[in-house]
Amino acid sequence: MEQVQAALNATADKATLTPQMQRMMNRQAENTKRVEETIKGTKSNPRWFVPLFCALMIIGLIWCVVYYLSPSGSWPIPNIGAWNLGIGFALIMIGFLMTMGWR
């Protein structure tokens, strides 16, 4: 086992490598550098972004379902009637619009 670890931890001398292996190692180093630069350049959303848009869509759905299931539209807000559907769909649409900004 120690011999395997020693072989894995050994570094290759570039003078002993074939030109093909040297080119392959150089390409790999360039690819690694390019990927690391790309990752550094990406922007990400705050941690609260995904739970917020999921919550908005779920609350909007629950709002619409409660309006449909309540007798004579007396819930969630009794005095506005069918505008309860507008509120529910607005919450859902805000959640969907937020998904477009998700990275």
UniProtKB/Swiss-Prot annotation:
Protein function: Involved in cell division.
TM helices/strands, residue ranges: 49-69, 80-100
Name of the featured protein: Cell division protein CrgA
Membrane topology label: Multi-pass membrane protein
Pfam family, one: CrgA
Any one cellular-component term (Gene Ontology): plasma membrane
Major site of localization recorded for this protein: membrane
HAMAP family referenced in this protein's UniProt entry, alphabetically: CrgA
